[in-house]
Amino acid sequence: MATPEEKAKALEAALGQIEKQFGKGAIMKLGETQKLDIEAISTGSLSLDVALGIGGLPMGRIVEIFGPESSGKTTLTLSVIAQAQKAGKTCAFIDAEHALDPIYAAKLGVDVKELLISQPDNGEQALEICDALVRSGAVDVVIVDSVAALTPKAEIEGEMGDTHVGLQARLMSQALRKLTGQIKNSNCLVVFINQIRMKIGVIFGNPETTTGGNALKFYASVRLDIRRVGSIKNGDEVIGNETRVKVVKNKVAPPFRQVDFQILYGEGISRNGELIELGVKHKLVNKSGAWFSYEGEKIGQGKTNAMKWLAEHPEQAAILEQKLRSELLANPEKALLADLEAESESNISEVESDF
């Protein structure tokens, strides 16, 4: 029988062989804080950047963002484009759904004059355009919206009642086999937006699945499940959504982190709201009763007023964001512990309210 030392050596050898064959990050310990040194593009959400482990979405990789309708998928990708453009990167949007609103995109901070956009006629054309952009080496971010709208040419040219079994899945599988190597070589971030469908006849387990077959699940380095979990109201008026994102797959850092943030209509991700919440959680912003204070100065009674103060003082907001980003990305275990503490405190308060 093998000794513990021999088992440890055998495990180390096996892990080394796997990383040599499939690349660094193919396997890691769940609680491991080590991350790959990969360039990242911010998502526009500080908490999501921290949950991803490297400060955003990884360059040179494929990312899938999926969720139900009106959950914030396109808003999140437009936020990624806005952040990439601020960093001087070239972005392209392949609008297979033919539904991109340039006015809304501009409100989220996207420079629509510089954004490359294509509205292809069929799935083959969309993926050929994506391939050409990636191969050029001149485009840094490509968004495909969405996989469900990548309709094969044969289906478009056929009759309405014709059956085309597995056409879209085969199309995606072939395209990803071609794309994946070029994406790595050109250091381009390719984001596929996907929709959710229900599997028929599933009694046990999750009946939800994504469109386009299984190929994208395997080729994606990061998969984000985005959901709308509530509404934000100003009186009786709904002004935004409470959004939850779970990192269901992550090849560049430990997966399964979950974050909540707000998406405000016409504004996008509430950056100042996140700064207040994360600042309180990590002791950079003090909360006493309903009052919030930052560096000894009271900044507002209630979260809304504190957010207004940050909006009126962008320099202070930028400093607070930089402090949080550097502290949490340098110490991901601290961020995880703070999340667990906050969750336990909320559970305790729920139990107390029940009594």
Curated annotation (Swiss-Prot):
ATP binds at residues 67-74. Its main location: cytoplasm. Disulfide bonds: none annotated. GO terms for cellular component: cytosol. The keyword Plastid does not apply. Gene3D superfamilies: P-loop containing nucleotide triphosphate hydrolases. GO terms for molecular function: ATP binding; ATP hydrolysis activity; ATP-dependent DNA damage sensor activity; damaged DNA binding; single-stranded DNA binding. It is found in: Cytoplasm. It comes from the Bacteria. Coiled coil: none annotated. Belongs to the RecA family. Can catalyze the hydrolysis of ATP in the presence of single-stranded DNA, the ATP-dependent uptake of single-stranded DNA by duplex DNA, and the ATP-dependent hybridization of homologous single-stranded DNAs. It interacts with LexA causing its activation and leading to its autocatalytic cleavage. This is Protein RecA. It comes from Histophilus somni (strain 129Pt) (Haemophilus somnus). The lineage of its organism: Bacteria, Pseudomonadati, Pseudomonadota, Gammaproteobacteria, Pasteurellales.
